[in-house]
């Protein structure tokens, strides 16, 4: 993901992140693949509405992870994501 965010002064910055969704079975992965476009869109808009400072605040990392899992699970009907793991998370 590349997400543009504004800081408190209104300056544009970019969040560049790569993550994996943790599932408990293959069928969950298949359901995620079926809904990938809307899931990606929802994640993008979740991250986009945050300020740049909030995104980089380590104290909010666990809350953001839980929020993202909740967001993903809103689009899944049969199976659920268990966690999200950030492989890369860079703010510029």
Give, region by region, the residue ranges found by the protein language model.
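N-terminal, polar/charged subdomain of small-to-medium soluble alpha/beta proteins
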Residues: 1-46, 55-58, 62-66, 70, ...
